[in-house]
Design a protein with these regions (language model features):
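Short, solvent-exposed recognition patches
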Residues: 101, 209-299, 307-314
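Short, hydrophobic/aromatic-rich segments at coil-to-beta transitions
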Residues: 42-48, 69-74, 139-146, 167-170, ...
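A generic structural motif
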Residues: 108, 148, 174-175, 246, ...
Length: 324
């Protein structure tokens, strides 16, 4: 059954997209992708951005400092439910003042594109990559980079990077009809320069309030040794990270990250219990994010990603459990 679905998806992809010359892409455009990746890792910046998914629009302020002690970030929602996220290297703290909840987590893989390695040209196997127009955004002259998918198993993307630094200033995610399903754009931005450390400190920490603390334990683990295997992933996707998460009294949750080098998909594996019950399963969607759930050997499997519905379903179907 899985091979039939995969063949149908590939056939649909061939019909939906014009044939492209294989793998070469635009060398200059690929160079821009490398510049964006390097800039995201090394630059300090502060600014306000707007994020839109579906009909929801959110405005946030972010500050990031990269120095000799590592990476320090603070993200604050400026509308909607108050929330603040503070990151120091791998540790991430999420403050939810309305419920007086502090969630503490670890981010084992902090790269912006989880599977991207030194050779960004591998993306050209999965996307037709070209340079677009130049445009002024948030006071910066930016170069547009267009990534058109070569099949129906991934969304298209359009990225705008600052001409001088490579900083990603705007991004759009586009479906198979070339409709925008998700986008973000800075409306005010300072790249580099003097950014005070106080700007990456929580405004809630150390004020003596009684926060309810939820700490997630995150440990890198080989889930294959526990019998969980990903077989026959969709073309271009591969496993890049796997870990085990624990929160409070709930059973540990397995977490696998799958990526095609640009889009990331999370696979969560959680034992069914009184707290975790089997639902109807199947597909749901919010903006560019598709979610697919199924049960495998008394476990609830949830696959979440900014990829087409067919991709999350194929990734969910690829998961098998063999009792050790």
């Amino acid at each position: 059954m899985r091979s039939v679905v995969l063949a149908a998806a590939l056939a649909a992809g061939s019909a939906a997209y014009p044939a492209a010359t294989p793998a070469q892409g635009d060398a200059d455009a690929i160079g821009w992708l490398r510049a964006i990746y390097r800039a995201t890792e090394r630059l300090s910046y502060t600014g306000t951005f707007v994020y839109q998914h579906g009909e929801q629009v959110e405005t946030s302020r972010i500050t990031r400092i990269v120095d000799g002690s590592g990476v320090h970030e603070r993200l604050e929602a400026l509308d909607g439910t108050p929330r603040e996220i503070v990151r120091v290297n791998e540790e991430v703290k999420c403050y939810l003042p309305q419920t007086m909840t502090l969630k503490i987590d670890r981010q084992l893989d902090t790269r912006p594109f989880p599977a991207m390695r030194a050779d960004a040209s591998e993306l050209a196997d999965r996307y037709a990559i070209r340079k677009g127009e130049t445009e002024r955004i948030a006071g910066y002259d930016c170069q547009a980079i267009v990534l058109e998918p070569r099949d129906n198993l991934r969304y298209g993307h359009k990225l705008w990077a600052d001409l001088k630094t490579g900083m990603l200033v705007k991004a759009k995610t586009l479906n198979e009809k070339n409709e925008v399903v998700e986008q973000f754009a800075f409306t005010q931005l300072q790249i580099g320069g003097k950014i005070e450390k106080d700007q990456v400190k929580s405004r809630f920490a150390g004020k003596g309030r009684d926060w309810r603390i939820e700490t997630a334990g995150v440990v890198a683990v080989d889930l294959t040794s526990l019998g969980w295997l990903l077989k026959s992933l969709p073309p271009g996707y591969r496993k890049v990270t796997e870990m085990r998460r624990s929160v409070g009294t709930r059973a540990d949750v397995g977490h696998i990250v799958v990526s095609d080098g640009l889009a990331a998909v999370s696979v969560f594996i959680e034992p069914l219990s009184g707290q975790v019950r089997q639902g109807p399963g199947g597909l749901s969607r919010q903006g560019a994010v598709n979610v697919y759930t199924r049960t495998v050997d008394d476990h609830l499997v949830t696959v979440v990603g900014e990829v087409p519905a067919e991709s999350v379903r194929l990734i969910a179907d690829a998961l098998e459990h063999r009792r050790p």
